From Swiss-Prot:
The keyword Transmembrane applies. Coiled coil: none annotated. This is Ferric transport system permease protein FbpB. Part of the ABC transporter complex FbpABC (TC 3.A.1.10.1) involved in Fe(3+) ions import. Probably responsible for the translocation of the substrate across the membrane. The complex is composed of two ATP-binding proteins (FbpC), two transmembrane proteins (FbpB) and a solute-binding protein (FbpA).
Length: 687
């Protein structure tokens, strides 16, 4: 215990942190290394050291000595804390502004400097009794603010600023010129029309299936769980490729229609039709999950009251249930609208001549003519549309209350749906199940064929090309990279999500709503825009981290941060605050309270967030497609390259492997989470 106390007191010493930064300045590069620590030459390493010559980086560390001199001024505790905060702000601003002006990319020692300044700011705020002087909470809050600023706010601002620059020249008129082009106007209108259509149809299908699982199904309700898992584990491009195998030029449905009905338009799929079909297949489950939860929260006693007043089933549904679902319906439409706007993979496979914003941004960056100005302008437009929708959803729908559950214990039974609606839903679900069965069957079968539409001979060549060339060739490097990056990103996502949730739910401070809003903003920023903004923000001074695995991990963490936060917020809402207060009253620190009280009780929710974050990190493409290199390529980028080269069989085979792997991971974690819950029999014995 004494050794632990001594270690803790060491970390709570400002002298320790200042000394650590000075040691880092001597031992680590203060300027960025183009080829990293392991591959840089001795001369490159020496040139990057801050002490190797008189340079700007010395001035970033020199003011730290001021913290050793402050006690000699014998200021009051409050005054000294304010002076320290002023000095910390000066060092941070001076370092980043000077690095930007003089094009100096920051090195590893600056990371230690930022950590030191965060620790010193924590001590200063503790002296001012912020958060009751709880250093752990203050430090966690400051770390989260820095994380959000550097990797959400800063890149978002960077993409807006860059659209007014033509290279190094300030050219605001180019925005009007780019947006005034007829082609760009058509791309924007295509995207908005497609997203609106997909949003409406996906919400209709989602409502139908939610009504089936909550009002019709008895033994077949498990279909809802399968329905909600499939889109999560399906990698990008795979749904689009599966639709192509069925309905494309050489698809078996197209050939059947041609043979028996004389259907000759074999290109009908490529364009709006194909993108809409693929997106509805991918996003209707999102609507289902939203509306399924909303329907389960409607108290059956309301329906019984309607029948008691002699209303028939049609009147009850359209006048009672449907109005209560309006917030969820609007929420579903807006979320699917954003997802459709941001979708990159399906338009790339099925778009044909129907161009949308997300793919056009990709072509501006990865195409033959590099055009950052047009990419950032279109990215800004896409971001503006997404942010407007997100703000409407967050501020309007989020603040509306349609409470139907009171404190009374009577539950009642849900009533039957109108017969016409019931049979319509059953027909819709039957069609959907058959279509999805054929779709995924085509995907798995297609991965074993020589050439779909030409030669259906079964073969293992596609899998041999992927995994039969050794660990250093084929798909192995991308799969290993993906597992490593996702394995690092998922725990960080859950950890930061827990910290943010604990601070937002359990602590009161100015700016709490802003912090929560900015964290949820990660969901609103389309993946393509996030990728472009990271290139613009981190491809030059002051922070140069493009081309590294670090930026990919950061992108994965920031994209999925709301998942961990929302899971922890939901769990904390079920834990009485008196548990925390009891721990703190026994002189337990906030860190011990979180680790020994909160974390064990939130384990099921956090494990679910962990596996969801892991799977999303495994399947992300639009946010990282611009960030990967030959050395950091991930699975989805490998699939994208195969699609671009026309190697559909190899791409489908890789997608099939990922589906199986991720389904196994989800089922494994579902089994673990099931074991972490207390069985009812044990709970009764404990009582």
């Amino acid at each position: 215990m004494d050794s632990i106390t001594n270690k803790r007191s060491l970390f709570e010493s400002s002298h320790f942190w200042i000394l650590l930064s000075l040691i880092a300045f001597i031992a680590l590069p203060s300027k960025a290394l183009d080829y990293g620590l392991l591959e840089s030459t001795a001369d490159e390493f020496l040139d990057a050291m801050g002490w190797s010559s008189v340079n700007l980086t010395i001035l970033w560390f020199l003011p730290l000595i001021g913290f050793w001199l402050l006690p000699s001024l014998k200021l009051s505790t409050e005054t000294q804390a304010k002076v320290e905060l002023g000095l910390i702000s000066f060092i941070l601003l001076f370092a980043f502004i000077s690095a930007t002006i003089y094009k100096v990319s920051m090195g590893y020692s600056v990371i230690v400097l930022i950590a030191t300044l965060t620790a010193l700011a924590t001590f200063a705020f503790a002296k001012l009794k912020m958060m009751q002087g709880d250093k752990f909470i203050i430090g966690a809050l400051l770390s989260i603010i820095l994380l959000i600023f550097f990797f959400i706010v800063y890149p978002t601002v960077a993409i807006f600023i860059s659209m007014f620059y033509d290279g190094e020249t300030f050219a605001p008129e180019q925005v009007v010129r780019i947006l005034g082009q007829g082609y760009i106007v058509r791309v924007i209108s295509n995207s908005l029309f497609l997203s609106g259509f997909v949003g409406i149809v996906s919400t209709v299908f989602g409502l139908a299936f939610a009504l089936y699982t909550t009002r019709i199904a008895h033994r077949t309700a498990f279909i809802g769980k399968i329905f909600s898992i499939l889109p999560i584990v399906t990698p990008p491009f795979v749904v689009g490729l599966g639709v192509t195998l069925m309905l494309g030029r050489s698809g078996y449905v197209t050939e059947f229609l041609d043979t028996y009905f004389g259907f000759k338009d074999h290109n009908w799929l490529y364009g709006f039709n194909g993108i809409a079909i693929a997106q509805i297949l991918a996003f209707a489950p999102i609507s289902f999950m939203i509306l399924d939860g909303a329907l389960k929260s409607i108290h059956p006693s309301i329906e019984e009251a309607s029948y008691t007043l002699r209303a028939n089933r049609y009147q009850t549904f359209y006048n009672i249930i449907f109005p209560l679902l309006r917030p969820a319906l609007a929420n579903s439409f807006l979320i699917v609208f954003i997802q459709s706007l941001a979708d990159f993979s399906n338009p790339l496979v099925l778009g044909g001549s129907f161009d949308v914003i997300a793919t056009q941004i990709y072509f501006y960056i990865a195409g033959s003519q590099l055009d950052y100005a047009s990419a950032s302008t279109l990215g800004s437009m896409l971001l503006i549309f997404s942010l407007l929708i997100f703000i409407v959803q967050y501020m309007w729908i989020g603040n509306r209350s349609y409470v139907t559950v009171s404190g009374k214990s009577y539950r009642g039974d849900v009533q039957d749906l109108p017969s016409g609606l019931k049979y319509t839903i059953i027909v819709m679900l039957g069609f959907w199940v058959v279509f999805n069965f054929a779709l995924y069957g085509s995907i798995f079968y297609g991965s074993f064929t020589v050439n779909w539409g030409v030669d259906y001979t079964l073969t293992l060549n596609n899998y041999a090309m992927l995994f039969g060339q050794g660990l250093s060739d084929g798909a192995w490097p991308s799969l290993i990279n993906t597992m490593i990056y996702a394995g690092i990103a998922a725990p960080l996502t859950a950890l930061f999500g827990l910290l943010i949730a604990y601070i937002v739910v359990r602590k009161d401070f100015q700016g709490k709503k802003t912090l929560e809003f900015l964290t949820m903003l990660c969901f609103a920023v389309p993946g393509t825009v996030a990728g472009v903004s990271y290139i613009l923000a981190f491809n030059d001074a002051p922070m140069y981290i493009t081309g590294t695995g670090i930026i990919i991990i950061i992108s994965m963490v920031m994209r999925d941060l709301p998942i961990g936060m929302r899971a922890a917020i939901a769990g904390l809402g079920q834990l009485d605050k008196s548990l925390d207060e009891a721990s703190l009253s026994l002189k337990g620190s906030s860190l011990k309270t979180i680790w020994f009280i909160v974390f064990p009780l939130l384990k099921p929710a956090l494990l679910s967030a962990l596996v969801t974050s892991f799977v999303r990190a495994m399947t992300t493409v639009s946010a990282i497609v611009f960030l990967v290199t030959a050395d950091t390529r991930v699975a989805t980028a490998y699939i994208l390259n195969r699609v671009e080269d026309g190697e559909y069989g190899v791409a489908i085979a890789y997608g099939s492997i990922l589906i199986v792997v991720m389904m196994a991971i989800i089922l494994f974690f579902d089994w673990i989470v099931g074991d972490t819950r207390i069985p009812k029999s044990q709970a009764k014995k404990a009582d």
